[in-house]
Structures are given as structure tokens and as C-alpha cells.
């Protein structure tokens, strides 16, 4: 069944406020959707092809009636867009009969999410693509979209907890537990942060493996760190609800020290976190996988302009004001 020939959807980026890496092993994390988004349009075309175009410069096409395998004779563009192709193929094959499957889908992607700095651009693109393509054929609820987006994202990050896709789908501040009961955290006012992009690229896969090796070699220590991370998350959820930025900032800095112990931070990141604290931030920590990437700082509202200027003067890093937004996936 075809509902419409053209569909659009957008999904937000995210920041991890607390609990990255530990969430993979069952500890909670707190994530928030932010005011940066990926926008996807999908339309029915007559050739039985899946065509994917991105404003990052990648363009690739696949045949609908063939499920390609990742890594087998694919061009660089096809490898880059493979998770989106996989998600689209799954939606089409589950929505159409054999006759209708002779149709194809053309997908256009536009993003204002910086890539590769820990903001969940991969998850957001999967969520928006599944939503846009799915809406061509049937009305789909958010849980259906989340499940298929996470399946596609795991082709990129095999150990993904699902947190990125979940917060991108449902929006807001989420207390997230892998395979557990998740809940939204209600706040009295919007939470805003300064995100500092170090420009240092990282491999999420390599960092996840590093943490896995650390856990295997230091089981007792890892368990202690995970328990501390859980306690920090629980206290942070209370601080967010109570609108207590001083307490929240201290908890952010404690979380960063746990990540230092895991070995996923870098000297540049640690120096940046210390400078943020010395410059008046309530708290600061790396966000995402680590290995460079980005730092988030919680800064008094009246000091944000001066804070950003000082950081730019000291490090020349890109400073991005971000705000936690209550809305996640949007369909048009």
C-alpha cells in the first residue's frame, strides 16, 4: 500500500550528559536531543532503485530487489550510505507486495549536525530516513521507527546501546537504560550548554573496543566505576528536576573523571575540561565516545558570551551553544 509519493522527516542530534560507555553494559545514561537536525525527504520513483543523496557530497544507488551485503564490492559512497539503504530496503520489503516492489525510492538528506564529533549524526540520519520512507507506505508509530533505526545504526556501531536512536526519536531529556524502562526527565526550564568541538576525529568502534578490553582486564574496577556512574546518573536526574546547576556541574566533572579512568579521554580533552572549570563553568566533561571529539560545559547564563570568547582566544576551538529541545522526530 502506498499512502503518498513524497514524505519528509527530521530528527535531532544529541548530547550525552551522563553515562556514555557504561550504558553499553547496563548502567543508565542521560541523553538530550539538541537544536541541530537532519532533514530527509523520500519520494517514490519508477525505476526499482534506492537512490541516496547527501549534502555531505555522497551519492549512491542500489537495486531494490537485491539485498546487498556490506563490504562486498561496494563503492565508497555505497559503504557510507549502506545503513540507510539497509533500513530503506527493510521498510520497502516489509510494506509492499512483489508487484509493488518494482517501485523505488529516492532519498535526499540535508544536515546541520557536524559529523564525527559525538552528536549522534548516524543515529539521527537512520531515524529520519526510516520515518520518511516508512511514511510513504503506512502510518508508523515511534517505537516501530526506533526499532528499525537502531537495527540500521548497529551496522555502523555494533555495540550501540540504542540510546542515540531513542533520544533522536522521542526527544527531550531521557534517562535511558539499555533494554530497560526509559523515562523523560522533566525540567523547570530549558537546559543549555556550550559544546566545544576539539576537531580531533575519533573512531567510535576503536573506543568501544578499548573499553571492552579495559573491562575484561579490570573486572572489579570496572564494576566499581559502573556503580559510580549509575549513582551519578541518578543524582543528575534529581539535579535536573530541581534546577540545581551547581550540583549538576559537579556531577558532570565527576563523570568526566570516570571516563579518564577508562582511558577514553585525551590530554587535549582533559586540559580543555580543566580550563572550562577554571573559567567559571559549573561543570564540564567529554560527550560521546571520547578520543577527542567534543566537550560540553554547563555555564552560567550571564557568562556564556565571555566564556565562549575566552575559549576561542585560548584554543581556537569551535564553540557551539546548544539547547536541549523537548521534541524529537518530526514528520511532515
Predicted features, each with a name:
Residues 2-18, 23, 31, 39-86, ...:
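C-terminal nucleotide
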Residues 13, 36, 291:
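Residues that flank catalytic or metal-binding motifs in active/ligand-binding sites
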Residues 34, 117-142:
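DPxDG-like acidic metal-binding loop motif
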Residues 104, 290-292:
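Glycine-rich nucleotide-binding loop
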Residues 107, 145:
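Alpha-helical scaffolds flanking conserved acidic
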Residues 110-117, 282-284:
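Short pre-catalytic strand/loop immediately N-terminal to key active-site residues, enriched for Gly-Thr
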Residues 118, 294-296:
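Short aromatic/hydrophobic contact patches that present stacked aromatics
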Residues 119-123, 284-290:
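Short glycine/threonine-rich catalytic loop with a Thr-x-Gly-x-Asp
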Amino acid at each position: 500500500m502506498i499512502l503518498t509519493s513524497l514524505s519528509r522527516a527530521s530528527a535531532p542530534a544529541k548530547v550525552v550528559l551522563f553515562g556514555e560507555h557504561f550504558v553499553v553494559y547496563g548502567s543508565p545514561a542521560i541523553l538530550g536531543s539538541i537544536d541541530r537536525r537532519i532533514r530527509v525527504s523520500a519520494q517514490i520513483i519508477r525505476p526499482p532503485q534506492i537512490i541516496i543523496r547527501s549534502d555531505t557530497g555522497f551519492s549512491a544507488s542500489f537495486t531494490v530487489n537485491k539485498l546487498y551485503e556490506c563490504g562486498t564490492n561496494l563503492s565508497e559512497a555505497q559503504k557510507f550510505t549502506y545503513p540507510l539503504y539497509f533500513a530503506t530496503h527493510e521498510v520497502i520489503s516489509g510494506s509492499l507486495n512483489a508487484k509493488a516492489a518494482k517501485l523505488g525510492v529516492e532519498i535526499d538528506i540535508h544536515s546541520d549536525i557536524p559529523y564525527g564529533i559525538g552528536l549522534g549524526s548516524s543515529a539521527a540520519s537512520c531515524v529520519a530516513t526510516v520515518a520518511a520512507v516508512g511514511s510513504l507506505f503506512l502510518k508508523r508509530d515511534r517505537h516501530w521507527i526506533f526499532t528499525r533505526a537502531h537495527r540500521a545504526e548497529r551496522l555502523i556501531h555494533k555495540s550501540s546501546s540504542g540510546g542515540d536512536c531513542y533520544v533522536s526519536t522521542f526527544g527531550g531529556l531521557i534517562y535511558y537504560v539499555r533494554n530497560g524502562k526509559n523515562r523523560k526527565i522533566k525540567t523547570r526550564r530549558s537546559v543549555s550548554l556550550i559544546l566545544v568541538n576539539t576537531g580531533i576525529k575519533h573512531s567510535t568502534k576503536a573506543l568501544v573496543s578499548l573499553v571492552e578490553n579495559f573491562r575484561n582486564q579490570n573486572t572489579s574496577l570496572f564494576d566499581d566505576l559502573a556503580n559510580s556512574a549509575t549513582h551519578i546518573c541518578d543524582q543528575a536526574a534529581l539535579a535536573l528536576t530541581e534546577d540545581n546547576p551547581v550540583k549538576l556541574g559537579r556531577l558532570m566533572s565527576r563523570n568526566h573523571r570516570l571516563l579518564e579512568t577508562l582511558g577514553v579521554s585525551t590530554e587535549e580533552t582533559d586540559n580543555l575540561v580543566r580550563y572550562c572549570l577554571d573559567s567559571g563553568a559549573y561543570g564540564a566533561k567529554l560527550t560521546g565516545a571520547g578520543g577527542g571529539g567534543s566537550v560540553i560545559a554547563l555555564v552560567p547564563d550571564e557568562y556564556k558570551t565571555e566564556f565562549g570568547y575566552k575559549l576561542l582566544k585560548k584554543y581556537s576551538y569551535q564553540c557551539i551553544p546548544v539547547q536541549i529541545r523537548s521534541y524529537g522526530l518530526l514528520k511532515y
